[in-house]
């Protein structure tokens, strides 16, 4: 497939700016970097709640680190596989994907995502990656109705789960609850796919693919995870596979660093949960470096800990390979990046360590639960009387959606998911707390 078709934008542009010689993907990167949706990541939860400590990462700093790791992966693959240099393409493309990958995630992390998914259960559901696709293609006001109007290849790369939610949803898999406070995230996992409301854009992105490629790329299968009852997609594009690896490495390594600095993960937990598994690794580098990395990670010397973090990131980045799936015709689908098996296992061990001692920590879960309640309370209030409570511009979007017979509840999810943690908490107080006073915050549209 010609590269030009992947550089096309959904809405043609005739902007001719003086002496502007940027590539299409450099323009995409600039649009993402300068967007309000990207700026709001500075006040959205990554793992540890915003306001707990000045050191830890927010979704903004996480996204910047994912971008750096993503371009590092591309540089390594370019040297390791020179024959794939044309496929790797622009560093600006990978930066765009990595910077944008979390833009759709709502306030309060997973708690906010589960809450919105529950409130949208009869209206197409909610999932952060699907919302990212929606923001980039429809909501961010770079254009009147086409969002950031990014290149087709950029939109293909952001598609982590290339299938509509209606194809993935398994009915009857969620227990109904009688009170919002009874909502358990494990019982309401979001369906990982594109919202059916955005199927027109999804179709446009996949337009260049052959019938066979599209059918295979969007195929689904039962999930192997016991707590995920819905069907799952099986494939992603080459660019997306690099972005996802960068995200996983940043999550496992950098979020672990935050937890170590704050004393949430200890050296004894490392020795108990990580060392016994990795010392038997089939890769000699992992076996040889393990003890030294463990010592430095928990050192009181800041530079030693940073050296260990750098060693871990470098170890994972240099262990990435390119796989070939000849069943696909399109090179962007035929080739995918992945970790060598021993390093994939090591990364999973680190991710499980973060999940066990950080994500599942009661104090973190209390913050997540609180966020759930805030998001559900806001949604319920706005849904009860949209033309009374929504900001004027959002009211107009809601009315337009109603008049056109579209999913007006999606407008409510768009508004709430765009909020920062602090803004959502403040708005909740103004709506429901008698002590909040009568000075309701008047702010510009989210």
From Swiss-Prot:
InterPro entries: dGTPase, dGTPase-like, dNTPase_2, HD/PDEase_dom, HD_domain, PHydrolase_assoc_dom. Residues 59-252 form the HD domain. GO terms for biological process: dGTP catabolic process. It comes from the Bacteria. Residues 1-28 are annotated as: Disordered. Keywords: Hydrolase. Residues 7-28 have a biased composition (Basic and acidic residues). One of its GO terms (molecular function) is dGTPase activity. Belongs to the dGTPase family. Type 2 subfamily. HAMAP family: dGTPase_type2. This is Deoxyguanosinetriphosphate triphosphohydrolase-like protein.
